């Protein structure tokens, strides 16, 4: 593997209680690009006996996995590698025996980090990859521990690591593999008892948003999306999934639409812990974080990437990597936001994320032109939906891509999406299309003075008659756009004044 001098590789390895993970990234254009993700289910925690000693079989599973990882580490500088062990290695009484051989296999030292250090690193991973402002509560359910962190920006204000996880809760409460109400109740109550000591501190600190940063939360979101729900996790949805799980008598028979076979074994135990957290901390809603422990380790090695506005960093990186006209992107964004303000801002698009999604789509809508002009919109959609965009959720990427697909020429209705209401998504598209037409000369000083007003879904664009006469191409484009929007039930009137 050759290394370009200006984009060195970094590796972060997490020896977890359920799985071992390896993340390989490179630093490019002010952002982080994922080069490889390798995961092996080792179930280390399941190998602990009653004296907390790791079985030979569990250690061998771990060593076999590390032999695979070692090959990938050969061409990465030692100072760009971090390897950490978490809850099970903190607990194991014979950890030295495991580490001695593990260090030999990898050729690099393994750090067994404390629960508090694990929580702090998880928070860094979330802060560097998840957008949004305000105070956040971060929940990470691992195999043998659960981390809860409250922080703001890059600063953690409360860090806790609790001795409960999806593997240990499986052994403690679902040992008979029965998915009964009794087992679920016991698992939820056990988790609540574990949470009680931190309850007062966390409630007094409070938070604005809650994010989940674990395989359990990722599995839940995949299930919900597969079943046609939106990506926001709520208590009602968790209880609904508990009922679905209880339709199977035994764990081996568990089949839920969207649940992978790999996650099925520890799904009920992880679900029980999350239900307890929602109920005890009275959480309204949770979304999936963009990263956690491994991302935190990687970003710790790249301190120059620290920037408070994650989304701004992402947009800047994409504009640089794809050589977009950032000044024009800003012009379209400014005009689109001005039009949004004229039609009533949150009165017309009530969701707080609406303006941000409009601005981002405007700044990146031409990305597809780097591939081809004729199908530029299609390429824009594909790139925006498939690029790694820290700070944006999967649903947000999907909506922005679908709007960018339709930013010019032929107009079709948006498909079902879960980032905003259907009405708000449609309205963002209408504003972007108008902003693109009105700014096509790519100079802010050449834009016409316009006033956009709304009566429900009917839009009226008032524009100077003399300007229209002097700019016949734009006048024709606006007339055509009025027909296109009106034809699919979105009335648009162009009014000269």
Curated annotation (Swiss-Prot):
InterPro entries per UniProt: ATPase_NBD, GppA/Ppx_hydrolase, Guo-5TP_3DP_PyrP, Ppx_GppA_C, Ppx_GppA_N, PyroPPase_GppA_Ppx
GO molecular function terms noted in the UniProt entry: guanosine-5'-triphosphate,3'-diphosphate diphosphatase activity
Reaction catalyzed: guanosine 3'-diphosphate 5'-triphosphate + H2O = guanosine 3',5'-bis(diphosphate) + phosphate + H(+)
Associated pathway: Purine metabolism; ppGpp biosynthesis; ppGpp from GTP: step 2/2
Annotated EC: 3.6.1.40
Keywords, sorted A to Z: Hydrolase
GO biological process: guanosine pentaphosphate catabolic process; guanosine tetraphosphate biosynthetic process; nucleobase-containing small molecule interconversion
Transcription regulation among keywords: no
EC top class named in words: hydrolase
Family from the record: Belongs to the GppA/Ppx family. GppA subfamily.
Job of this protein: Catalyzes the conversion of pppGpp to ppGpp. Guanosine pentaphosphate (pppGpp) is a cytoplasmic signaling molecule which together with ppGpp controls the 'stringent response', an adaptive process that allows bacteria to respond to amino acid starvation, resulting in the coordinated regulation of numerous cellular activities.
Protein known as: Guanosine-5'-triphosphate,3'-diphosphate pyrophosphatase
Organism in which the protein naturally occurs: Vibrio vulnificus (strain YJ016)
């Amino acid at each position: 593997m050759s290394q370009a001098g200006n984009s060195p590789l970094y590796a972060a390895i997490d020896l977890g209680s359920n799985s071992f993970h390896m993340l390989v990234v490179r630093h490019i254009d002010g952002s982080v690009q994922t080069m490889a993700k390798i995961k092996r289910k080792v179930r280390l925690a399941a190998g602990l006996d009653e004296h907390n000693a790791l079985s030979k079989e569990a250690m061998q599973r771990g060593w076999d996995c590390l032999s695979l990882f070692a090959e990938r580490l050969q061409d990465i500088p030692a100072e760009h590698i971090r390897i950490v062990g978490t809850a099970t290695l903190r607990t194991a009484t014979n950890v030295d025996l495991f580490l001695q051989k593990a260090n030999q296999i990898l050729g690099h030292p393994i750090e067994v980090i404390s629960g508090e250090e694990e929580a702090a690193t998880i928070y860094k991973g979330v802060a560097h990859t998840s957008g949004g402002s305000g105070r956040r509560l971060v929940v990470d359910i691992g195999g043998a521990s659960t981390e809860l962190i409250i922080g703001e920006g890059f600063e953690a204000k409360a860090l806790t690591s609790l001795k409960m996880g999806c593997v240990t809760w499986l052994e403690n409460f679902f040992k008979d593999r029965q998915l009964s109400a009794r087992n679920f109740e016991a698992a939820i109550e056990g988790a609540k008892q574990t949470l009680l000591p931190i309850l007062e501190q966390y409630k007094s600190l409070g938070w604005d948003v809650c994010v989940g940063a674990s395989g359990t939360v990722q599995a839940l979101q995949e299930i919900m999306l597969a079943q046609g729900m939106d990506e926001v996790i709520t208590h009602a949805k968790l209880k609904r999934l508990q009922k679905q799980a209880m339709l199977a008598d035994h764990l081996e028979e568990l089949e839920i639409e969207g649940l992978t076979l790999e996650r099925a074994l520890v799904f009920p135990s992880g679900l029980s812990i999350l239900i307890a957290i929602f109920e005890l901390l009275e959480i309204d809603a949770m979304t999936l974080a963009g990263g956690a422990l491994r991302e935190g380790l990687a970003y710790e090695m790249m301190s120059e990437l620290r920037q408070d506005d994650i989304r701004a960093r992402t947009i800047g990186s994409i504009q640089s990597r794809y050589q977009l006209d950032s000044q024009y992107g800003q012009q379209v964004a400014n005009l689109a936001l001005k039009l949004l303000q004229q039609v009533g801002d949150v009165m017309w698009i009530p969701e707080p994320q609406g303006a941000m999604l409009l601005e981002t789509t405007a700044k990146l809508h031409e990305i597809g032109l780097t591939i081809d002009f004729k199908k530029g919109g299609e390429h824009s959609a594909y790139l925006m939906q498939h690029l790694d965009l820290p700070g944006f959720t999967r649903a947000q990427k999907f909506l922005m891509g679908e709007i960018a697909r339709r930013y010019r020429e032929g107009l079709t209705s948006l498909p079902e999406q879960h980032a905003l209401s259907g009405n708000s998504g449609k309205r963002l598209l209408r504003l972007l299309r108008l902003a693109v037409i009105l700014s096509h000369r790519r100079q802010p000083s050449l834009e016409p003075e316009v006033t956009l007003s709304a009566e429900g879904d009917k839009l009226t664009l008032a524009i100077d008659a003399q300007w229209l006469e002097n700019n016949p191409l734009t006048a024709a484009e606006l007339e055509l756009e009025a027909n296109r929007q009106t034809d699919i039930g979105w009335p648009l009137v162009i009014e000269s004044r």
